[in-house]
Amino acid sequence: MRVLFCMGEKSADGRVFVRPSARCIAIEGDRVAMVHSLQYDYYKFPGGGIEPQETREQALVRETQEEAGLLVIPDSIREFGCVRRLEASDGAEYDCFVQDNFYYLCRVERTTVEQRLDDYEAQEQFTLEWVQPKRAIEVNRTVDHGPKNQNMLEREARVLEILQQKGYFSTKE
């Protein structure tokens, strides 16, 4: 999968913790499906960590359903690109956190199912929203999100900008 960009200044030295993830890009017209944290007011693409026994695509389908209640149409899944994020760790177990975020374009069913949120996701009140990219970028870059990792929010904003530049959205916006 092609690399869209890399984030972080820390090199992957010392004790490294690697956590790959798969993320869903579902677009309809001038809007994209995103998870909105009502508690901290930020937007993220549905998706999350890839379990050891899963393929990227399996994780994409599972995580999108869990976080957003969206059912991915498996034969619509297409690679978009990867973002590598490196961060120094504040924990004692490892020195560097490495996350390869694999983004996939896909279509989703019109009907949604009940979310199956982790405790922190429920606490943050994760809600599916079909949002215009300009709005999600603005919120992620200008609102105080409390303790949330600003690098994650900037990653999502940059991916949205790439999608805009490549013409994936209709021009209603």
Regions found by a protein language model. Give the residues of each.
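Class I (Rossmann-like) S-adenosyl-L-methionine-dependent methyltransferase catalytic domain
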Residues: 8-13, 84-86, 141, 145-151
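A short coil-to-beta-strand element that immediately follows conserved catalytic motifs
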Residues: 71-81
